[in-house]
Amino acid sequence: MCEMKKNYFYSILLPLVIIPTGGLLILGTCYLFYLFIYNFVEFWFFPTNPTAVPADMIRRVYALALLIFYLALLRTKISDIIQSTVLVGPIGIFFTTTILAFYEKPVMAIAVTVVIVAVGIFLLYKYKKPWIYYYALVTTLLISIVLAWPEA
């Protein structure tokens, strides 16, 4: 009986807490690093005209770089719970970038986000990833919508 409770704790309860908590910390770190990059570009390349900073381009390149980093991380032997927790950062930035790219066209933002989620679910299924990756994907989607969706 004790072994069953221990297994339940490590396989279900722990991921339910670690993924959103650790994921939020990683997502926050990703946002702070984006802010650092943005401020660096503004300070060194656009000191007299801060509104000329190509924020969209910086955000898109950064999101792509994070996705490439995450794909490299997937090839390591790091545990699934750490990989799924780290997934929140790159995917969160990617969702936010997508939503902001279609900020004035909410229907298009929804359509592209649904396509990204569908591709993500397909890839997770194809590579037989455990449920914690799906949980991380859905958690990230909800967080990104709250953070990036246009206010009414």
What are these regions (language model features)?
Residues 30-45, 95-104, 146-152:
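Juxtamembrane "helix-exit" motif on the non-cytosolic side of transmembrane helices
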Residues 121-152:
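Terminal transmembrane helical module of multi-pass membrane proteins
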Residues 11-27, 89-92, 140:
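Alpha-helical transmembrane segments
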Residues 61-81, 117-123:
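Canonical alpha-helical transmembrane segments
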Residues 83-118:
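Short alpha-helical packing/oligomerization segments
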Residues 77-89, 131-135:
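Membrane-interfacial loop-to-transmembrane alpha-helix junctions, especially the N-terminal start
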Residues 20-67, 86:
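Hydrophobic transmembrane helix segments
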Residues 1-9:
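Short, Lys/Arg-rich, polar N-terminal cytosolic tail immediately upstream
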